[in-house]
């Protein structure tokens, strides 16, 4: 941020558009381009404008951390502002921020209107959180019939590899 990157870019929606457009042009057509943003830098007054710049630039999915840079990681997360963004863009929006429990996930989905979540610090403190959310909110087994984690989200995303498989490769 001291060098104008990261969340500082949220002060310059046109720069966000330029960057995502360049990534979209450089990436193979079959490879999805996604972006992650906070609600803003000092405040959330440009949140929708930034989200539209990212979507118009070619992002096919947008993750929104429901706080500004100035908010840092202090509660609360403003999930209802994620809903404002979701309604303003024509790409899938994923809610992120302050999801520590299944109940938090439920409240986040309701307030944001999103169909999916990105977990951050909550999954570090509870590594089983994603599986608990999948089971409790969506009634899904953590694995499909072939024992693989089902892929959700953007089409053409790389396959999900179970952690146990990754450990055998180390």
Can you describe what each PLM-predicted range is?
Residues 1-4, 65, 127, 132:
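Active-site-proximal loop/short-helix segments
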Residues 1-16, 67-78, 141-142:
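Glycine-rich tight-turn/loop motif centered on a GG-T
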Residues 1-48, 52-57:
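Active-site entrance/lid segments in N-terminal catalytic domains of soluble metabolic enzymes
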Residues 26-28, 32, 44-61, 73, ...:
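Alpha/beta catalytic cores of nucleotide-metabolism and tRNA/nucleoside-modifying enzymes
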Residues 36-38, 65, 96:
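Structural motif
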